[in-house]
Regions:
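N-terminal secretory signal peptides and thylakoid transit peptides that target proteins
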Residues: 2-18
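Short beta-edge strand/loop motif at the mouth of beta-sheet-based domains
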Residues: 85-93
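Charged catalytic carboxylate motif
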Residues: 10, 48, 52, 90
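Short, low-complexity N-terminal intrinsically disordered segments enriched in polar/charged residues
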Residues: 15-66, 70-71
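A beta-strand edge to alpha-helix "cap/lid" segment located at domain peripheries
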Residues: 30-43, 79, 92-167
Length: 167
């Protein structure tokens, strides 16, 4: 890349791409390089968000941390941003520690796509800090839920991105 093409956008895009290769390589034998990936097609249907997803977000929004987490299989994996949490209870405990330490959240579903064993969600989360001197933010979210092969009603692996919350 020559100097005249280096913009803030290309710099941010390049910086954002760096950790993706290592996350992909560490996740369920997913190849780090596209040339190593077997390509396939999948049909998605845009539909209303299912009850399990709404119940999960409600547990976080209400800070109740209960049955909404039952959408995850017992040994589910979550990679939310830089997290690497293993097990339903670890997912619950780590989200609780993150949210309870400083803000109240409200999740808003904008669109939900059902692709069978892969569910895709896009929306926003309003994050209101407990400290009134801090500003409320509303970052975008995108989440991929890979459902369990044996029990397709349970999430086996969750990949999610939220933010950035500030620049």
């Amino acid at each position: 890349m020559n100097e005249s093409n280096l913009t803030r956008r290309t710099l941010l895009a390049a910086a954002a791409a760096v950790p993706l290769a290592s996350v992909a390589a560490a996740s369920e034998n997913i190849p780090a390089h596209p040339k190593d990936t077997n390509m396939s097609s999948r049909t998605f249907t845009k539909t209303a968000a299912p009850d399990w997803l709404l119940a999960f977000w409600r547990e976080i929004d209400d800070k109740t941390w209960g049955r909404g987490f039952d959408c995850f299989k017992e040994d589910a994996i979550a990679n939310l941003g830089v997290s690497d949490w293993h097990g339903r209870q670890a997912i619950r405990e780590n989200l609780r520690a993150f949210v309870d330490k400083g803000f109240t959240a409200h999740h808003e579903v904008v669109e939900y796509w059902d692709g069978g064993s892969l569910k895709v969600f896009r929306g926003f989360v309003t994050m209101k800090p407990n400290d009134p001197t801090q500003k409320t933010v509303r970052p975008a979210m995108t989440h991929f839920f890979y459902m369990d092969e044996k029990d397709p009603s349970k999430v086996a692996h969750w990949y999610g991105s939220v933010g950035p919350v500030a620049f």
